[in-house]
Amino acid sequence: MSQPSVILATASYDHTIRFWEAETGRCYRTIQYPDSHVNRLEITPDKHYLAAACNPHIRLFDVNSNSPQPVMTYDSHTNNVMAVGFQCDAKWMYSGSEDGTVKIWDLRAPGCQKEYESVAAVNTVVLHPNQTELISGDQNGNIRVWDLRANSCSCELVPEVDTAVRSLTVMWDGTMVVAANNRGTCYVWRLLRGKQTMTEFEPLHKLQAHNGHILKCLLSPANKYLATASSDKTVKIWNVDGFKLEKVLTGHQRWVWDCVFSVDGEFLVTASSDMTARLWSMPAGKEVKVYQGHHKATVCCALHD
């Protein structure tokens, strides 16, 4: 199977993962996934594999194959896996789960390599661009930085007590992190390197972005925009310089669960409970393609172009 230049995948409560031709909107591959719903999708940096974070396992699929079977299954979590991602060379994978743990997996060997206890259910995990720190957010409102070299929590903060941290995003150059919560608020920090090379958080901005839940926040690769996807059916685009609202993307009929930027930041893909994924032009702020085919809520999407 020849690999398309743009890999676009979505997953739904209909127990399928679908691959789409980004330009035409045609679904060219469907993976049936009866064991569980999929919470998160992530494509490896080399475009070879797609990770599906499920309940309670992670499965790795070959992007270039038509096989419905995963090439690897990662079992060790005991509850919903809510976050998954890869180190820049795809040597290892990280995950976060509602079982209260953050885990590291070596893609070249079976089994969990490292485990960090967050206690509360983990909703979101991101990898710092330095590749040596993971930042997690949990249901109790805690944000923790995990030092992968020291194997310990090097920093902990609570932006809003007893308010779940739903999503985290870190700037590509490692200078900023944004946390979004269930009350529609985004907290922005400047990231500083401490005396012992530990990352320190300097409060920068508090943004009341939506009246409903924020389900995903994401900084664009060009370090220009912050996207916030919400239960209010919209995605809002904020200019990182001052966090002024630039655009509101409207068209979805239900909650917007996920979003992902193209590598140049010119396009955004969104996934919604209205059973669709959509492609948006950032300069125009307009919808340019709808991906239809799922029979239930589309809850996550992955893009690698």
From Swiss-Prot:
Predominantly, its location class is: other
Which top-rank group of organisms is this from? Eukaryota
Matching SMART domains, A to Z? WD40
Offer a single GO CC term for the protein.
endosome
Which CDD domains does its entry note? WD40
- Repeat (WD) positions are 1-30, 33-71, 76-115, 117-156, 160-199, 209-248, 251-292
Q: Which family does it belong to?
A: Belongs to the WD repeat LST8 family.
Protein name from the UniProt record: Target of rapamycin complex subunit LST8-1
Organism listed in the record:
Arabidopsis thaliana
